[in-house]
A protein has these predicted regions:
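Extracytoplasmic redox metalloprotein regions
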Residues: 88-149, 153-154, 306-310, 315-316, ...
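Short glycine/threonine-rich turn/loop motifs
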Residues: 266-373, 438-539, 543-546, 552-559
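Sec-exported extracytoplasmic/periplasmic mature domains
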Residues: 43, 47-50, 63-77, 116, ...
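Mature extracytoplasmic or organellar-lumen-exposed domains after removal of signal/transit peptides
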Residues: 22-278
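Post-cleavage N-terminal segment of exported redox proteins
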Residues: 13, 18-23, 217-296, 382, ...
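Active-site pocket scaffolds in enzymes
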Residues: 212, 542-570, 577
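C-terminal substrate/ligand-recognition segments
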Residues: 516-529, 534, 570-577, 581-590
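Sec-dependent signal peptide recognition
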Residues: 2-10
């Protein structure tokens, strides 16, 4: 706790220091009032904890505080992201692997674990301690908001991000994993937005009225939820949330509100979270000179099939990444150059450019480093990019491609070959699956079974709390600045009772939380990428669903002391499991 409280005052206002000054707006005053209200409710919750209130009273007070927080989440997450991750982040240690240290979790989700399903008086001291930390975090938010100027462009951008947050986290149970109060909380978030938007302009318009009407109708639809599991998320997103995002874009254009000048994973021009023109691959590059161009990708495509990168000239990138199998190889694990089994399953390269870590063990941060790692690996290619530069530069079939890709360069350099290969991989994001078309093209509809599968995925199955919509990987929305790993207890063999011995991220960082931890991969094109898991233990999607339904490794009887996947059974019916598989098959890109 001390380490957490020490770092909080270090958060600065640098992000806003160079911005144009605007007259202070109404949203700021309202926001400060709501922060004060939240603080009062947390203090009331604290008093209940001190007075040995009943379990029901504690939970009701907690839920009241959560609903108030959700009203200001749009601003807290946007303007104070560092405190926000401790206010409402997962109840897991916050790892800082480069420094080999971690921060204990805090905030609402830690408190939720203490009081749900029932509160034990043995946890009274822990509860009071966590409430004190939460109050300190709220104070940090108040001080920060008091010091900044909130201008219309930031408000609109923050509201956009909140809409994406509701879709990807808010309605999936990500931050309400035990109480399952996600739908009322999403409703609270929505109901807070009209007041914020109305304060941006003194001149209402039909566009503004339409936007506010859609938001209120979306909030009203939340009342249709009988419970967390039965809520129709597919309908909610398509008919309510996506149109709000589109209206927000129209509202911004009508009032000539500028875009915020920043490099974001979601393009400023995106009118929803779904489609082929939403994500910015340049948000995941090492620096601006690595920016994507189609010319680089074309050069990279030729290099991808070039066997000269391997020492013996027998293997190219395509040898293990077959386009017909979504750039995998269909093997449990591939073979090394000497014919022995490699340690891990070959992952898909589709959508690999939209994550902040590469390889199962996340040992490289970007695709440029990934390509170099593979080429130099003695078991995989055993090549040397430097030695190959002259051969490629002098090859007539490459010369025009090189000139188009890097027109300002006098000679080809190593980083450019890496960048070209990476650019080709960054071009493999089609976003044209049946799932994508369902949310972008009125004429395309998921079947009843597929929609049930999506609702299970984003609801009862809790799949979307790790495989985030719409990338379905572990890159955390809506900022997409962090890619997560999980410990799920994958067995050494199917139906086995021993965990696979692969150390995962622990091999690079000797932190107990990372033992057997692996990156959360994308599920896009999963129907083409069998077998599954880092070791290829499962042969079908059906087997994977059964494994998760049982609670992962710990749920099946494997000893996994640090499993991050809840070990409780999901209790999915046969119909739900079948529907879940049917849904995952809709994530296959069209050719």
């Amino acid at each position: 706790m001390k380490s957490l409280l020490k770092i909080l005052p270090l958060f600065t206002l640098l992000f806003f220091s160079c911005q144009k000054e605007y007259e202070t707006l109404g949203p700021k005053e309202e926001l400060l009032q709501q922060i004060a209200q939240l603080n009062q409710e947390i203090e009331a919750f604290e008093q209940m904890a001190q007075k040995n209130a009943s379990n029901k009273q504690l939970q009701q007070s907690f839920e009241k505080s959560r609903l108030t927080y959700k009203k200001i989440e749009w601003a807290v997450e946007y303007f104070t992201p560092e405190p926000a991750r401790f206010i409402n982040g997962p109840a897991l240690d916050e790892l800082e692997v480069e420094e080999n240290k971690f921060l204990n979790p805090s905030g609402f989700q830690v408190i939720e674990e203490l009081i749900y399903p029932t509160f034990s008086t043995k946890e009274k001291a822990a509860l009071q301690r966590e409430i004190a930390v939460l109050k300190g975090l709220i104070m940090q938010v108040k001080e920060h908001v008091s010091a900044i100027t909130i201008s219309p462009d930031y408000v609109v951008d923050a509201v956009k991000m909140q809409m994406y947050r509701i879709i990807t986290l808010g309605i999936t149970g990500f931050d309400s994993p035990i109480s399952n109060n996600s739908i009322p909380e999403a409703q609270a978030s929505l109901l807070a937005l009209p007041s914020v938007i109305e304060k941006l302009h003194q001149e209402p318009s039909q566009i503004q009225n339409s936007l506010l009407d859609r938001i209120r109708k979306a909030a009203a639809f939340c009342n249709s939820a009988k419970d967390f599991n039965s809520f129709d998320r597919a309908l909610f997103i398509k008919n309510y949330l996506n149109p709000i995002s589109k209206n927000l874009q129209e509202f911004q254009q009508h009032y000539k509100i500028a875009n915020v000048a920043k490099t974001n994973a979601i393009l400023q021009t995106a009118s929803s979270l779904f489609g082929s023109k939403v994500f910015n691959v340049d948000a995941f590059i090492p620096s601006q000179e690595y920016a994507y161009t189609s010319a680089k990708a074309q050069l990279g495509k030729e290099l991808f099939y070039d066997t000269s990168f391997s020492k013996e000239g027998t293997r190219s990138c395509a040898s293990c990444h077959n386009p017909e199998l979504a750039f995998t190889d269909g093997l449990k694990t591939n073979l090394s150059l000497n014919g022995s089994q490699l340690l891990r399953n070959t992952p898909t390269l589709t959508y690999a450019g939209l994550q902040n870590a590469q390889f199962w063990d996340m040992r490289q941060t970007d695709l440029e480093k990934q390509s170099l790692d593979v080429i130099q690996n003695k078991d995989e290619m055993h090549g040397n990019i430097r030695d190959n530069i002259n051969n490629i530069s002098s090859n007539p079939s490459y010369q025009k491609l090189i000139q188009k890709a890097f027109p300002k360069s006098k000679k080809l350099e190593e980083w450019q070959l890496q960048n070209a290969l990476a650019s080709y991989v960054r071009s493999l994001n089609k976003f044209n699956s049946k799932f994508d078309q369902h949310f972008t093209e009125p004429a395309t509809e998921l079947s009843e079974e597929e929609q049930l599968g999506f609702n299970v995925f984003a609801g009862k199955g809790k799949c979307a709390t790790c495989h985030f919509i719409p990338l379905f990987n572990g890159t955390v929305p809506p900022a997409y600045k962090k890619t997560e790993q999980e410990v799920i207890g994958t067995p050494q063999i199917k139906n086995g009772k021993k965990i696979d011995p692969d150390l995962g991220r622990y091999a690079q960082y000797k932190m107990p939380q990372l033992l057997h931890a692996f990156k959360t991969p994308t599920l896009r094109n999963a129907a083409l990428t069998a077998p599954y898991m880092h070791n290829g233990a499962f042969e079908s999607l059906e087997e994977v669903v059964v494994f998760y339904n049982e609670g992962g490794g710990a749920g099946t009887g494997i000893t996994v002391d640090n499993q991050t996947l809840p070990s409780d059974k999901l209790n999915l019916t046969d119909k739900e499991q079948k529907a879940l598989v049917a849904f995952m098959k809709t994530l296959t890109d069209s050719k």
